[in-house]
Design a protein with these regions (language model features):
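Short, conserved beta-strand element in jelly-roll/cupin
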Residues: 50-67
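Short acidic-glycine-tyrosine-enriched beta hairpin
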Residues: 69-88
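Short, charged/polar surface micro-motifs in flexible loops or helix N-caps
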Residues: 35-41, 62-65, 106
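A short, N-terminal "cap"/entry segment at the start of jelly-roll beta-barrel domains
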Residues: 1-41, 48, 115, 120-126
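A short, polar/proline- and glycine-enriched secondary-structure boundary/capping micro-motif
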Residues: 41-43, 77-79, 109-113
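Short strand-coil-strand connectors
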Residues: 25, 68-72, 93-95
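Ligand-binding loop in jelly-roll beta-barrel domains
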Residues: 27, 86-111
């Protein structure tokens, strides 16, 4: 099973970047590409402590990913493979491409909150 990142369904597309995602065989696959710095933290409001409760495994293709935890911060750069523990808030640097994998069962409740917040945000921008 495989596909091009361009063929993944879009969650978000805007001039500052895109976020594509699908679910295969119990795994969630995400591809993100951002031309500008992006802080998706506001999309996490409604989750405990406004932090993502799902673990992720990822690879930074280019750019930088900053992950903030309650007690520390981790920075991943191009070429880094990473494990992101639950209880985090991500931020993406300009010109960043990132691929992440998550257990779909753990990610679904997070995406329910994120989807509601994204829809509300998009309505205020209209």
């Amino acid at each position: 099973m495989h596909c091009s990142t361009a063929d993944l369904p879009a969650v978000f597309e805007a001039p500052q970047g895109m976020w594509r995602m699908t679910e295969w065989e119990g795994m969630n696959i995400e591809y993100m590409s951002f031309q500008q710095e992006v802080d998706p933290g506001p999309l996490l409001h409604g989750l405990p402590d406004s932090l993502c409760s799902c673990p992720h495994w990822g690879y930074v293709i280019q750019g930088q990913v900053r992950i903030t935890f309650a007690d520390h911060e981790e920075i991943y750069n191009a070429g880094d493979v990473c494990y992101i523990a639950p209880g985090h808030r991500p931020a993406f640097g300009a010109n960043t491409e990132f691929v992440a994998f998550s257990l779909a069962e753990s990610y679904r409740p997070v995406m329910e909150v994120v989807s509601k917040n994204l829809a509300a945000l998009q309505q205020t921008e209209v």
